[in-house]
Amino acid sequence: MRPLDENLRTSAASRPAQSLSVRGQPEAESGAFGEAIADAGRRRTQGQGGRTSADDPRRDSVANGGNASAVPKADGFGADVPASMADAASPDARPASERAITTRDQAAKRLQHGHPAGTTPLSLGRDGAGEETAEPVEPAAAHSRETVHALRDAIDEASGMTATEGDENAEPVGGTVSDLLSMLTGAAPAVAAALQPEGRAKPASAVRDGSDGPAKAVGGISPDVADGAHPQTGDGTGGSEPDRLFRFARADGKGQVVSMSISRDGERAVVENSRSSVKPGVETVTVLEARRYLGLAVNENATSVTTAIAGDSGWAEALQSSAATTKPEAWSQAGKTLNTLKIQMHPVDLGMVTATLRLKDDELQVDLKVETGEAFRQLRDDQSEMVKALRAQGFAVDQVNIVFNGGGDSASGGGGQSQAQAQLGYEGRERAGDDGQGRQPRDGGRAATERWAGNDATDDVPDGAERSRAGHVYM
């Protein structure tokens, strides 16, 4: 901008009157209009602090906003009016705060209008060939994006006005920028909901933090619970399953009752001796027998004798017993302690189950005895799972022996068979008695006949008597 003329720096009253002629008209004094222009130019000069610029006034006017009123013009008296005087009367000479407020109002109106009615907003995307294509998007997403762009442009405009305004009297626009930022923060949940493709929208706190994961719990309460949503558990049943409680007691009622709590996954077990009361849901395990057999250690004398015998093949074959031949592992079991445990359980779905456990070092042998066919089938199907569970506890288990004990059925069947045999024996004895009574007179007659045959005819009668005796069975 060009510096003002020296005559404009002086007051209008002290300046000598200038004669202006327009198209040969006589000279006339400048009126109130000229004095107003001169006063405005002086105020503008004092505000800028005597700044000067070597650039062209037209270029400065375009850089300040492209306002046509900033270009030097000719006044009604034929003289050029300086650009600074024209800028003083232009609307851009308002304070920066007023211009920022105006910009914010314009941005708010732009947000309210949005897209015209009946139009579908489009989003730019790239197809497989890499070319940009326009695809329709959801109205909420398009409106949210338009909101963000409008607010960002408004902030840039306000910041640009603050940066270009170099006057010392310029007012700060921090409040305006804060208002725009608050509007942007308020629009953040809508933007997050629009940009979320599927599933549940991200919480507002995650959007503000710039994180992709769920919002962190504050005060032990997660945002989902605070919003009223029900938290999901890992198993989907609404809660973890309780531990199973077992109560061990002797069959004769003596000794102390031991309670064991085992987690559902079998990873944790707690044994307590003080819990002796029977509670609902507790499975009772009756201990029938618990013994411990101490193995006999082989002394030095026995070892030396055994070594000498084993060195002679003849003695070894002669003294080797049949037990050692059939069970060669029996020699290696010397000196080991054997623990046996026999328990009885009453599961609801299996009936009575008797388990016999034999533990020697880490080797465990399990025998299960059941009384129903359904229990036998279920345990046989779960045999491999039981072996895996015992091996996970550190035991060396080859297999679990399951025995079907139909003792009750066989006993009842044997009793019926013995009763039938007794009844048949009683009937046989009755028939034998009847036969004896009928044969007694015949035997008496046969004896008389034999005696008579012995006296008179000894040739034919003895042969007939022998034939008759050969066909009878005597009890």
Swiss-Prot record:
Region ranges (Disordered): 1-175, 195-243, 408-475
Gene Ontology biological-process entries: archaeal or bacterial-type flagellum-dependent cell motility; chemotaxis
Sequence ranges of Low complexity compositional bias: 79-100
Entry superkingdom: Bacteria
Compositional bias segments (type: Basic and acidic residues): 143-155, 427-449
Biased composition range(s): Polar residues: 9-22
The keyword Cytoplasm belongs to this UniProt entry's keyword annotation: yes
This protein's UniProt keywords: Chemotaxis, Cytoplasm, Flagellar rotation
CC terms in the record's Gene Ontology section: cytoplasm
Membrane-spanning ranges: none
Keyword GTP-binding applies: no
Gly residues composition bias: residue spans: 408-417
Principal location class: cytoplasm
Record's function text: Required for the rotation of the flagellar motor. Has a positive effect as flagellar rotation increases when an excess of motd is present.
Stated name of the protein: Chemotaxis protein MotD
Annotated source species: Rhizobium meliloti (Ensifer meliloti)
Gene: motD
